Amino acid sequence: MLLNMNLQELKQKYNYDVATKMMQQYLDIKFAHLDCLLLFRMGDFYEMFYEDAILASNVLGIALTKRGKNGEEEIAMCGVPYHALENYLTKLIEENYKVAICDQLETPEEAKNRGGYKAVVTRDVTRIITPGTIIEENLIASAEPNYLASLVIPKNKETASLCYVDLSTSEIVVVNVPETEILNELARLKPREILLSENLRSSNLADSIFKQLNFRITYQVDSFFAINKCKKIILDFYKMKDIKGIGEISSSQICAIGSVLEYLSLTQKQNIPHLPIPRIINFHSYMTIDFSTRRNLEIVTNSQGDSQGSLLSTLNHTVTKQGGRLLYNFLSSPLTNIAKINHRLNITEFFYSNLEIVKKIRELLKKTSDIERCLTRITMNRSSGRDLLSIKYTLETATIIKEVFFDAYGFNLPDFIEKIIKPLSGDAELYNLIDETIREDAPNNLNDGGIIKHEYHPKVAQLHDLINNGKLYIEKLKDQYRKETGIDSLKISHNNVIGLFIDITAKNVNKILDPKFIHRQTTVNHVRYTTAELQKLESELVNAKTLVISLEKELYADICSQVIEKASYLRMLASSLSGLDVFCNFAYIADEYDYVKPEFTDDLSFDIVKGRHPVVEKALQRESKSFVYNDCHLSELERIWLITGPNMAGKSTFLRQNAIIAIIAQIGSFVPAKSAKIGVVDKIFSRIGAADDLIKGQSTFMAEMLETSAILAQSTKNSLIILDEVGRGTSTYDGVSIAWSVLEYIHDKLKCRCLFATHYHELTVMSNFLPALQNYTIAIEESGKDILFLHNIISGAADRSYGLHVAALAGLPESVINRAEQILLKFEKTSTGKGKNILSTESNNLSLFYLEPNKTTISSKLDKKFSTIDPDKLSPKEALELIYELKKLV
């Protein structure tokens, strides 16, 4: 509502003309930031007023009070202590509020000196905090990026441009994305905030981003993305004369980069970050994993959105924050280039072959700091002495890490390792700068003082000496004056009216002969004096704290500017340390969990021997149980495995396991298997599980069909598709028909690798006429009414699903199970002979499913039946029933 008002209407609503000067100042700033919650600094508190106060009180759970009246209207107010601001910001950001921080730009004393005792302290917004522009450690996850993204859709709509930046680490990237892959790319990045043109507010894209991905969108007017404006912003930001300095980029990429930089400028005010030139990447360099597949495979989060139980949590044994973020990025973006994959695998293999080095490096890495985020805080004037000390300690540790390599290999390191550790040599100039200037006990807050070493600057030493030894200097001056006057009872005292003064008894007044003693006050029994020397000392003592803090801030800013000059090197060092952490992590888990180096080919191989699901395996190990490994042998000649078998037997685990092995392999890690030979996978798609999407008004079946449709539309020959129970949620005939046609399409049109699990046993006959499709099932052992799931994948087809056994295991009442057995028996009797012939009996009307009778299958069934018959033990009635049964088989 407020956003739709003009300035005059706003002033009228809030009785602006009769408001106090301070409240007018608040309203002026609020009117300029109507889309934000305004936190207004007043002394030791950040206050909120009017509607902001009511909203913040509810969200933060803090008391709502009043600050007098504005005209006839009472002013609602609430506040939070300035030192606890981050705690409250966390809640506001989690609730997706945009927060404007309004600070005091001068002290009350400075305001009085400027405009008298009625002067209002100057205030202004120093930054606007949004989910995508956070840099505070306490407000963002340490082990994952915090992206702000700008999405620009050109008029042809074939290719979109996406620029994303992590302000906390100064990473900035731009990429062109096919229009059909926009949601998948956003799912990969998981940006905290997306900038989008107002013209797209009602588009299907915006609807999908919000409803399917649940990402925050910040809309901007269309002119925000104007090409000429964005080009100028880029040139000014990077101090370039030609846009080609960025590289070969399209017009829409210019708009994406420029709009991101403009948004950072608007939110960060004067503290614009020092960002490197945007890195231009190729969308096809990374494996495509759509948002539903990421959810189904639980790659970086589990189904509830937490990291616990995800693939990331299983593989993450990194020991640094930046290493954790790099692993997160690796898992989100598996490679598709064989050379780059093998390069990573060679690094992993080197460390796997040098586990003693790995052990030493991991211990040393624990002593390093997150210098990426330290550097960002320094460049944005939000750092503390602790950040500089963190850089110093990390530089020191980096050189020790390099010595570990040198001690083991001398100058004979492989080139790919030498390249990683090159930045570890350190920077003596930078190290010495910090070592000589910053105290080891430097506080977090610059306003506390005590950051700069005393010996670095003589004035700092002098001021601290005054602060620490002020009383001693007063005592020395007192002793001096006693000697000069001969008055042993002379004292130097203090009160709030005249400050420091020399105090003597009235009877000694005749001894004060030197004119330097200036009379200040006479009481009944005492006379008080001062001197120029005492006044100077008093002034120095009173101002020492303020002066030293001001001087230290000035010196600190100069030191930070020198550190910023080393930003490129520090980013390389951070990259080196995070890379070491990730590859040592890969070597560690390969050794700890018996992983093997995969081999990559350029064909359709997917040959996994004794593969395991890493997450399930780890969960079973906690229960002292073993995981049952399985093979998977897909190839050009056997591209599709049709898997049938009982519920709870492990079909879904097997499907997920192989998709996960492909992902792990293509990030450069060893994999949970005895051996693995993989043709590079360009895209992974999964259709696993069932859930109604009530928010979008979609049934389970509709959601499934939409996902399946997207898979068939986007897959290529090099993709890996895993499908579980396609076609359920509708009638049996409809479901079988859909599953059948999907399988045919994958086999004949896409010709890609596919694992297809189903309870439609009718589909198994497709192996008779689809040469690249083979039947597999899950081995079980039956003992009377009991079954044992062996979890082994074996060649063949299941003829039943054992649903009643699973129902019994789930605890259904025995009477229900018994009744279900009776009904099942009746169904089986009335449908004997129809089961796998349902489709073929309809074949005259549906040519899609027309099958030639399979004599081999019939013969095998007859053989199986005859092998169980003992003619000598058949009664006449049993023999007659057998004849009818055999006739149905034929």
Curated annotation (Swiss-Prot):
Pfam families: MutS_I (PF01624), MutS_II (PF05188), MutS_III (PF05192), MutS_IV (PF05190), MutS_V (PF00488). InterPro entries: DNA_mismatch_repair_MutS, DNA_mismatch_repair_MutS-lik_N, DNA_mismatch_repair_MutS/MSH, DNA_mismatch_repair_MutS_C, DNA_mismatch_repair_MutS_clamp, DNA_mismatch_repair_MutS_core, DNA_mismatch_repair_MutS_N, DNA_mismatch_repair_MutS_sf. Keywords: ATP-binding, DNA damage, DNA repair, DNA-binding, Nucleotide-binding. The keyword tRNA processing does not apply. One of its GO terms (molecular function) is mismatched DNA binding. One of its GO terms (biological process) is mismatch repair. It comes from the Bacteria. ATP binds at G645, P646, N647, M648, A649, G650, K651, S652. Belongs to the DNA mismatch repair MutS family. This protein is involved in the repair of mismatches in DNA. It is possible that it carries out the mismatch recognition step. This protein has a weak ATPase activity. This is DNA mismatch repair protein MutS.
